[in-house]
UniProtKB/Swiss-Prot annotation:
Pfam entry (one): PNP_UDP_1
Residues where a purine D-ribonucleoside binds: 5, 180-182, 204-205
Reaction equations catalysed: a purine D-ribonucleoside + phosphate = a purine nucleobase + alpha-D-ribose 1-phosphate; a purine 2'-deoxy-D-ribonucleoside + phosphate = a purine nucleobase + 2-deoxy-alpha-D-ribose 1-phosphate
Domain of life: Bacteria
Entry keyword annotation includes Acetylation: yes
Keyword check for Transcription: no
A GO term from the CC aspect: cytosol
Gene name tied to this protein: deoD
Described function: Catalyzes the reversible phosphorolytic breakdown of the N-glycosidic bond in the beta-(deoxy)ribonucleoside molecules, with the formation of the corresponding free purine bases and pentose-1-phosphate.
Protein name: Purine nucleoside phosphorylase DeoD-type
Feature type site, description Important for catalytic activity: 218
Length: 239
């Protein structure tokens, strides 16, 4: 049954959904990587599609920017449409010197300055982590594809334009691989509602050096990330 934010019916979504922030990227993934893809959501322009990848039913849908937006969509997908696994595929900024542009980062865990997980966890710290099997499958998929993916912690920020530059020093000290805006929220939603989740990001800019990828470079590396996500789903079928 349709929700306020998703005009689909039960069965329209696969049990696994890839989620970029940008709905147009969801459309690109569906058109480029899925066979027989059909649109299953268009409320507020947040496009969603379902098709098959090498015979495996998979869905893809945008989640917007920030934890509040992605939390709405992931919650409804899990509780109203029977989705079991969420894979966020997006971009992140690097702070560590050895993390370079176009690197692929697999988010084993996600720190955050948001209070959403404290709200749901009775004001205690919640360890926002990805599902272990999904992490392992993504690592194995990356190796099979010849992509040298990094695995570690992300930082999910509430502010894109942060006024606290010193926080990047703290992130570097604690070995944060990438800064983005959603992973911790998605991991919290998955834990609350009994689903599994993973975030895979491509480094699109370096916060320290101010380097940025070009549109063409982003697209090429983005494709590597999507292939890792899709192949990891196939590996999950063998569990």
């Amino acid at each position: 049954m349709a929700t306020p934010h998703i005009n689909a019916e039960m069965g329209d979504f696969a049990d696994v959904v890839l989620m970029p922030g940008d709905p147009l990227r969801a459309k690109y993934i569906a058109e480029t990587f899925l066979e027989d893809a059909r649109e299953v959501n268009n409320v507020r322009g947040m496009l969603g599609f379902t098709g098959t990848y090498k015979g495996r039913k998979i869905s893809v849908m945008g989640h917007g920017m920030g934890i509040p937006s992605c939390s709405i969509y992931t919650k409804e997908l899990i509780t109203d449409f029977g989705v079991k696994k969420i894979i966020r595929v997006g971009s992140c900024g690097a702070v560590l010197p050895h993390v370079k542009l176009r690197d692929v980062v697999i988010g084993m865990g996600a720190c955050t300055d948001s209070k959403v997980n404290r709200i749901r966890f009775k004001d205690h710290d919640f360890a926002a982590i990805a599902d272990f099997d999904m992490v392992r499958n993504a690592v194995d998929a990356a190796k099979a594809l010849g992509v040298d993916a990094r695995v570690g912690n992300l930082f999910s920020a509430d502010l894109f334009y942060s006024p606290d530059g010193e926080m990047f020093d703290v992130m570097e000290k604690y070995g944060i691989l990438g800064v983005e805006m959603e992973a911790a929220g998605i991991y919290g939603v998955a834990a609350e509602f009994g689903a599994k989740a993973l975030t895979i990001c491509t480094v699109s800019d370096h916060i320290r050096t101010h380097e940025q990828t070009t549109a063409a470079e982003r697209q090429t590396t983005f494709n590597d990330m999507i292939k890792i996500a899709l192949e990891s789903v196939l590996l999950g079928n063998k569990e």
